[in-house]
Amino acid sequence: MDAQGDAGAQGGSQGPRPSNKRLQQTQAQVDEVVGIMKVNVEKVLERDQKLSQLDDRADALQEGASQFEKSAATLKRKYWWKNIKMMIIMCAIVVILIIIIVLWAGGK
């Protein structure tokens, strides 16, 4: 047999052998899966970074809320005492007015 006959018998002129074609298809599928997995890993890393930033912002908001709560409680106490002082002053003025009226009415 000549070289062409051997090549024709082996299927060299007909293209790749079926096992090579299957191997190429499998390799293409593996490459596709690897590409998809790389994209997924990148997305997971981005998500982790965003979650970390969100956690930091939540901590800052919690700290701000705690400070606001303390300030509000302090302010509430301050105005409660101012209100009590005003009530005491009003009562003292009313008592003084009653005493003045009683003394003025009793002096006649």
UniProtKB/Swiss-Prot annotation:
Residues 107-108 are extracellular. The keyword Repeat does not apply. The chain crosses the membrane at residues 86-106. GO terms for biological process: defecation; nematode larval development; regulation of hindgut contraction; regulation of nematode pharyngeal pumping; synaptic transmission, cholinergic; synaptic vesicle exocytosis; vesicle fusion. One of its GO terms (molecular function) is SNAP receptor activity. Part of the SNARE core complex containing CBG09569/SNAP25, snb-1/VAMP2 and CBG03570/STX1A. This complex binds to cpx-1/CPLX1. This is Synaptobrevin-1. It comes from Caenorhabditis briggsae. The gene is snb-1.
